[in-house]
């Protein structure tokens, strides 16, 4: 599929998880469109280090950037020399993440290609609430009664948390090409600590800008663990928020609409809320989706995400004030 000379330039073959990404053709078409557009933007700017600033997937003998061996799907990506990733989430790297993901969205704001949803309804809050309500109606594991408090709290916030979908239907909020898996380790850095490019593009698809903003903060600004049993550990770290937001707005405010900017605090709350809904639905269903390490694991996760949500809500006025100072 890939000749010997090419293989010497490449990392090892990578299998595509087609259990999650069932439409591999769409998945790779999205990635090809995005990397081609970014490459064109970099060329127009006169970038001299393009091969380290955007991913490149090598074509198979079919001409496509993936192939099927009869059982699995594979692809090969060109090696990026002298590049590394970091797991650290601190204000410095959170700022870099904000710059990188904001710049990623900015470069793709005028992409002419129409991308598909590689995971349909991935960040659709109305869809996630329907899943929860269906789980409650079925009560397959007989657990609804014990989680009534969380169900009531979720429903109390449901109208507010679904406003992105409503605003989109009203024509006020656009969908844009987003990364949809914004973690600090999804960025490549050079030997001097400068950001090279955003990686792991499997989830690139149309979404609201809230996806990339809120998803990073859900994990990066959580002072505790996603499944922390001690809720005293779980709070929203405003230093991480400020660093990420500063970087994000520096690179993204040129294309963002006022309605997108003013709803960034909503985005910070949306993702712990959404994950709370998903963990709770799985607990009610009898733990059929997420891997668990003990019987109450999904309930513990639910409680931790709800505590994070409450902390985000408490910091909303401070977030609004900081965002205003960045514009």
What is the meaning of each model-derived region?
Residues 5, 16-130, 209, 225-229, ...:
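Conserved ATP-binding subdomain of kinase catalytic cores across diverse folds
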Residues 185-225:
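Catalytic activation segment of kinase domains across protein kinase-like and atypical kinase folds
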Residues 312-316:
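Long, compositionally biased intrinsically disordered regions
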């Amino acid at each position: 599929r890939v000749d010997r000379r090419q293989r010497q330039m490449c990392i090892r073959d990578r299998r595509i998880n087609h259990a999650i990404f069932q439409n591999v053709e769409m998945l790779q078409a999205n990635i090809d469109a995005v990397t081609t557009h970014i490459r064109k933007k970099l060329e127009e700017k006169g970038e001299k280090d393009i091969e380290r600033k955007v991913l490149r997937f090598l074509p198979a003998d079919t001409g496509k950037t993936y192939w099927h061996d009869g059982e699995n799907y594979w692809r090969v990506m060109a090696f990026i020399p002298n590049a590394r990733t970091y797991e650290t989430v601190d204000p410095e790297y959170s700022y870099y993440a904000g710059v990188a993901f904001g710049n990623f969205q900015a470069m793709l704001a005028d992409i002419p290609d129409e991308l598909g949803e590689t995971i349909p309804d991935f960040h659709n809050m109305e869809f996630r609430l329907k899943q929860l309500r269906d789980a409650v109606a079925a009560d397959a594991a007989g657990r609804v009664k014990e989680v009534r408090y969380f169900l009531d709290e979720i429903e109390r916030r449901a109208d507010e948390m679904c406003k992105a979908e409503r605003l989109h239907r009203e024509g006020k909020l656009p969908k844009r090409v987003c990364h949809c898996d914004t973690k600090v380790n999804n960025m490549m850095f050079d030997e001097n600590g400068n950001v090279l490019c955003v990686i792991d593009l499997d989830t690139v698809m149309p979404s609201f800008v809230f996806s990339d903003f809120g998803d990073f903060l859900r994990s990066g600004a959580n002072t505790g663990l996603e499944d922390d049993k001690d809720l005293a550990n779980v709070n929203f770290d405003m230093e991480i928020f400020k660093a990420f937001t500063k970087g994000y707005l520096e690179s993204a405010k040129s294309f963002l609409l006022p309605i997108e900017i003013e709803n960034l605090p909503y985005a910070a709350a949306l993702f712990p809320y959404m994950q709370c809904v998903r963990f709770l639905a799985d607990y009610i269903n009898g733990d059929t989706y997420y891997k668990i390490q003990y019987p109450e694991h999904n309930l513990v996760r639910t409680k931790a995400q709800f505590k994070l949500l409450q902390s985000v809500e408490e910091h909303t006025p401070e977030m609004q004030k900081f965002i205003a100072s960045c514009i």
